[in-house]
Amino acid sequence: MKILFLNGPNLNLLGQREPEVYGRETLADIEAAVRERAKQLKSRIDFRQSNVEGELVDWIQQAKGKFDVIVINAAAYTHTSIALRDAIAAVGVPTIEIHLSNVHAREKFRHKSLIAPVCCGQIIGFGQKSYILAVEASVHVNEINKSKQNAI
């Protein structure tokens, strides 16, 4: 099984940007933990980060037929990007939205996710563990999809 992890703007600054909100782990630390958990679950991951909305859209579009699940921390684009929402809806690859912090306990403008309606689920507020839970959820989503395909 193949999982595409996409990380949006400013996540390259993890470990130095607002550690009281996002934690002290760097994105490289999180990636290492994700790779370890994915290996335990016999899954492969591709882990990417971009500050550019269009690049994230391109990666989502390219995922069709190559990845079983997309996991996305769209960061600030979560609340603003119709382009990401439309790309997720268009490709038909099951997508899980994740966030390190509990966005609902933060500023009001962070409470609305434009991508949530086209994602199969959300994992928020567990820090680095959000990413580990997303690996486990991806395996679960993939198993459900395989069961549905076998039933047809």
Residue ranges and their predicted role:
Residues 44-54:
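Short beta->alpha junction loops
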Residues 63-70:
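Short acidic/histidine-rich motifs immediately flanking catalytic phosphotransfer sites
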Residues 9-11, 75-78, 101-103:
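Short glycine-rich anion-binding loops that position phosphate/pyrophosphate groups of nucleotides
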Residues 14-28:
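Glycine- and acidic-residue-enriched helix-capping/strand-helix junction motifs
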Residues 1-3:
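Extreme N-terminal starter segment of soluble prokaryotic enzymes
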Residues 81-91:
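Short Gly/Thr/Asp-enriched flexible loops that form oxyanion-binding sites at enzyme active sites
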Residues 55-59:
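Short acidic active-site motifs
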Residues 46, 96, 105-149:
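Short, glycine-/small-residue-rich phosphate/pyrophosphate-handling segment
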